Amino acid sequence: MKIVWCGHACFLVEDRGTKILIDPYPDVDEDRIGKVDYILVTHEHMDHYGKTPLIAKLSDAEVIGPKTVYLMAISDGLTKVREIEVGQEIELGDIRVRAFFTEHPTSQYPLGYLIEGSKRVAHLGDTYYSPAFTELRGKVDVLLVPIGGKSTASVREAADIVEMIRPRIAVPMHYGTYSEADPEEFKKELQKRRIWVLVKDLKPYEGFEI
């Protein structure tokens, strides 16, 4: 499995011959992403939905998201669109995706996604700390966690989430575009609490394999 951070909350996950793009924000570079098979959108806010219509049309990709995203995509003229709800599981090629609840009060239907292929990746979208994340404990190899604060978890809340879920690898996101949060502070917070997890502090369009 290969995971590439494309900035903000946007990731490209490639596994078992399937390419999934998550939350393509308005400034993402579609040329550097290339062709994808599916686009997962966690919620309707434009810093997550952003370039979904453009990239979907360029790639002939299917767009998957909660009700608000489904309606937005249809209104944008897309035809390969699927709605997903909390607790629902779907198959994307040889990859299984399950939608789960996230704590983002300014969104109508906020979701996170557990992506299960050769490894298990959880994308939290925009969220604060939530006790509901106990369902993910021990089930996540790579956690994509927001640290930006304001409308998402702060550095300290992100550490709370990591402590609860206990992934092997944590990748900070949702900073550097609309937030001045520092991933180094996230690392320090984890170290201070003696939460031993590998933190991948990526540059935009940098990736790794697991």
From Swiss-Prot:
Species classification: Archaea, Methanobacteriati, Methanobacteriota, Thermococci, Thermococcales
Top-level division of the source organism's lineage: Archaea
Lipid biosynthesis found in the keyword field: no
Family to which the UniProt record says this protein belongs: Belongs to the UPF0173 family.
Species per Swiss-Prot/TrEMBL record: Pyrococcus furiosus (strain ATCC 43587 / DSM 3638 / JCM 8422 / Vc1)
Residue spans crossing the bilayer: none
Keyword Hydrolase: yes
Keywords: Hydrolase
GO molecular function: hydrolase activity
SMART domains in the record: Lactamase_B (SM00849)
Protein name: UPF0173 protein PF0020
Pfam families: Lactamase_B_3
Coiled coil: none
